[in-house]
Amino acid sequence: MSKNVTMNVRDAISASEAECFVTIEGKRYNFMSAINLEAKMEKTKSEIPILGRTTKGNKTTGSKITGSATFHFNTSIFRELLYRYKETGEDIYFDIQVTTEDPTSSVGRQTVILKDCNMDSGIITKFDADGEYLDEDMDFTCEDWELVEKFNLISGTM
């Protein structure tokens, strides 16, 4: 009986070992106030009837990219974008770059750039007399993304 190969615990990526930068109109901001961020690509599929089969096939016909972030309520960068839209009607798109790298892991780092992101909504103002700290959530869409750096394969994967 062969020995089962398992993942080395050090290759589990620490959840907080990341960098996040936002680029708006050529200005690059260190988005260190981010608490979490997640972006995903959802494929659009159509059911395709196939003669001679009782099951339908599924064909990918497109996709959309959405994301969400939670960050500390200590920056006005995104409120400025909302205010600018309110005042001028100009909707500003921006890029988000996320690098995930845990120095303990052997997989190295991964860098993704979310391109042409656009906020769905945003907090204008906020307080909480009973809270510990203030944070805010932001949902957004993206037009594209790029995998700039990818993780190395975990030892034993192949």
PLM regions and their residue ranges:
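Solvent-exposed edge beta-strands and adjacent loop segments
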Residues: 2-81, 116-139, 146-147
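Charged, amphipathic alpha-helical segments and their flanking helix caps
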Residues: 1, 104, 157-158
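Edge beta-strand at a domain terminus
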Residues: 138-140, 155-156
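Short, flexible coil/linker elements and helix-boundary hinge sites characteristic
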Residues: 16, 88-89, 152
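Short, acidic/charged, Gly/Pro-enriched secondary-structure junctions
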Residues: 82-113
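Short acidic DE-rich linear segments
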Residues: 149-158
